[in-house]
Structures are given as structure tokens and as C-alpha cells.
Amino acid sequence: MCRRAACREAEAEARASPGEMAAGGLSRLERKAAERVRRLREEQQRERLRQVSRILRKAVAERSAEEGRLLAESEDLVTELQGRSRRREGLKRRQEEVCDDPEELRRKVRELASAVRNAKHLVVYTGAGISTAASIPDYRGPNGVWTLLQKGRSISAADLSEAEPTLTHMSITCLHEQKLVQHVVSQNCDGLHLRSGLPRTAMSELHGNMYIEVCTACTPNREYVRVFDVTERTALHRHQTGRTCHKCGAQLRDTIVHFGERGTLGQPLNWEAATQAASRADTILCLGSSLKPPSLVCVCVCVVCLSIRPFPQVLKKYPHLWCMTKPPSRRPKLYIVNLQWTPKDDWAALKLHGKCDDVMRLLMDELGLEIPRYSRWQDPIFSLATPLRAGEEGSHSRKSLCRSREEPGPGDRGAPLSSAPVLGGWFGRGCTKRTKRKKVT
């Protein structure tokens, strides 16, 4: 009775407003009826899609005659579902980690070594994969930041002050000393390139450095290198560290470029040098990056990519680093070394599947170079660091670096260290912005 009354009321309303019918062509009641029909058809289509999907998951021999007829009547749905299945399988295969057998890897490394020797201007591009050996998680690996977030799990990391430059970091520094590498373009914020002894003029840390804070009120900007993670209180779009400039008293800020932000600082980002290196390079050795947009991906030229696991997607694009305006004959060759698929595989002259440290060890052996060992006593961060002023000791709670592991760091005051995981201010910040949180009931 209620529905009939509603219909009569709708008809009366439609008759009372002929202007509306003339203007729109349909009465309000007719539009509502058409909308109900549309929704009903959509629900029927979804239910049919679910039925077809359940049938396709069965073995052919297990399908009934009625189910066979339903599939025959739903060719479009079958084609769509089979296409979805192929795409899912393709994505799974791309996420799988594949290793070349030892003999094949050595053969490929010999070819890579030849490319390094013959390069006129070699630029190294690095991502999170080169730091996994230092117990710093990557982003897309099995235990990476993005992977854990997608599973709804929390992100944690070991105390980053315990991280030290890896074999790959030290190999890059050696290659630069031997004038085989001209510049390093890095997406990493962990400061391990700086601590490996690589000159600051020879690197561009495009996403910042966790050990550096700056005063943007001073001209030029005044840098403060610290022996602790300065990002404890910072986050996406919130960069003040809580300390002040020794000269002008303005608030200091970190140098981290989070996902969705655009880096504007001169140093340590050093974009000018990165762009110049990209335009001059004929070879790029890329370690630890997925080369997936919208990450920094490769810098315009030959990319020799040694990547264990992919890196975060912090900024959307770096088109001016690609130099794709050059004719194909002038573009550099592409060499990729990665355990996983990358979107640049088809462009590569050679694809190697291997871990960064493993490949770099073989490469340095092939080049006849000895890999220097990292020493905290020779870590340049201690000579570059600006000590905290009196009264600033309590401005952070992160463990400070020290030359000896037994020596208490500056500002630690001998306080006992917590065994709980420590999460750096920059690590994972901005990643959680787009994750869905489960409602607590």
C-alpha cells in the first residue's frame, strides 16, 4: 500500500509540474524508475560475473552441462575474466625474484666490466636495494615498506645509527677514486654514500640526507651535518627539526623529500650536478632501483642497473633526467641487473639477475680493484659534523654515531639503549598517507 501511495504521489507531482517533464523529457517518477532498472541490471551483471568466475575456477571435467551453457552464453564475461587472470599472473611473475646461475652471472659481469672500462662518462644511480645489506629495508621487497603497508602491517626498522656502508657503497667510492665513475645520483636518505667517503661534490642525494639539517633563512643556505638522525620530529610537509641556526636563530629544517613533495634545496639534493651528469653521461650504473615510474628511474642515459629490490616511489617523475630528446643513436646503452622485472628490461642491452653486493664483488674482481673496508675511525661524517650547542643535547632522542661502538655518542649521556625497533623520522613517512586504515569497532 505504501508503494502504491508513493507511486500515486509521484504521478500527481509529475502532473503538477509539466514544465519539468517538458524540459527534461522524463518525469521525476520515470527517471527514478529508469535508475532502479539500471541498478538492477548492474547487480544482475555482477552476479553473473561472480557465477562465471566460480565456474572458470573449476576443472573442465567438473563443470555441469548447465554451467557449460552459461559459459557459452557469456563469452564476453569469460574473455574479460581470462584477461584479468593473465594480468594477475603477469604481475606475480614480475614480483618474483630470479637469480642467474653463477656461471651465467660471471659471463654477464664480464660484459658489464667491459662497459665500465669503455665508458667515457659513467654515472651511478642508486636506490634502496644497495642498503638492504645494511639492514635498512627496501620498499617493494618481501619485507619492504610498501609490501608491509599493503598487508596492513606496521613499519619498523633497526636503529639506523647501527647501519654502515655496504660493500656496494665502498665499491662505488673506489670506482670514483679510480676515475671510472664521475658522479653518483642517489634516491637514498640514509647518508651511507657520504659515510663511505664519496666526496659531496660527486653525488646528488635527490631525496635528502637524514644526517643533514639546513637554515633556509641564511643566504646561501647554512648546512649542519649531525651525527644523529635529524628527522625524528619531521614528517610530510612538516620539516622543522626543533633546533635553530647558530648564526641567525631561524628554525632549522631537514632535507628529506617525501612522496608527493618537490625538492627545492640546493644541497644535498644537488640537482644541478645531477642534470649535468645526465646530459654528459654515456653510461649509468644503476643499483637498487626498480626503474618503475613514478620513481626517479634512470637518468637519461645508459643505465647499468644493479638492483636487488626496488625503491620507493617518492616523486612522480624526473623527465629532464631522461634526455629522451636525443636521437636513438646517441642514447646510451642500458644494462640492468635486478632480481625482479623492471619496465626498462626491453630497452636493456643486457639484463643481469643478481644481488648488488654479489654483482659488485664480481665486478671489482673483474676490474682488478680491491674493495676498501669501511672504518668508523675514517668515517668523514665526524669531521663534517657540527656539534650541538649547550642546551641542545635534549633536542633529540636518537642514538648518535660514535667512532667506536663502545664509545657513547655525543649527547647520549650514557643512557641505556632501548632494544625496541627504532623508526627514522623519514622512513616510511608519506607512504602511509594513501593507505587505508581499518576501522576499530
Where are each of the predicted segments found?
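Conserved catalytic core of sirtuin-type NAD+-dependent deacylases
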Residues: 2-441
